[in-house]
């Protein structure tokens, strides 16, 4: 059986590589270095199950990226994974039902694995 696909968007290459290496046996991880690339990857891979995005990125931030994802893919389960606690963004994400979780970097492997597994059964 094929591994579930997750998309991880982050403007820092080291974070992309780390998440990909961490979960290479659990998920098929598709990475993108920008929100624009993330939207392209979603168009190319409609079977992506979970979308994880950094918050602070140039051009389009993570929440705006997730808003774009949800416009065309309301069924996608989205999460923010960030080094910044921004309560207003977190509240907007939850109140508008844009995000499933708001997680902090550095991530804990077991916590992130469990969260993605929860997202897959939604």
Where are these regions (language model features)?
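Active-site residues of response regulator receiver
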Residues: 10, 54, 82
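Helix N-cap/capping motif at the beta->alpha junctions
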Residues: 11, 31-40, 62
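Two-component/phosphorelay signaling modules centered on CheY-like receiver
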Residues: 13-31
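Conserved phosphotransfer cores of two-component systems
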Residues: 43-46, 69-75, 96-97
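Active-site beta3 strand of CheY-like receiver
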Residues: 46-52
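Receiver (REC) domain active-site loop signature in two-component systems and cognate sites
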Residues: 57
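Alpha4 helix (beta4-alpha4-beta5 surface) of REC/receiver domains from two-component response regulators
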Residues: 64, 85-102
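C-terminal output helix
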Residues: 107-116, 120
């Amino acid at each position: 059986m094929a591994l579930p696909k997750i998309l991880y968007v982050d403007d820092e290459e080291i974070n992309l590589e780390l998440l990909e290496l961490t979960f290479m046996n659990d998920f098929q991880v598709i990475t993108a270095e920008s929100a624009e690339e993330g939207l392209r990857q979603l168009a190319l891979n409609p079977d992506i199950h979970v979308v994880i995005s950094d918050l602070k990125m140039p051009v389009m931030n993570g929440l705006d990226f997730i808003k774009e994802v949800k416009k065309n893919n309301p069924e996608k389960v989205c999460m923010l994974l960030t080094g910044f606690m921004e309560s207003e963004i977190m509240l907007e994400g939850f109140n508008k039902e844009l995000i499933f979780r708001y997680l902090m970097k550095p991530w804990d492997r077991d916590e992130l694995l469990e969260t993605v597994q929860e997202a897959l059964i939604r």
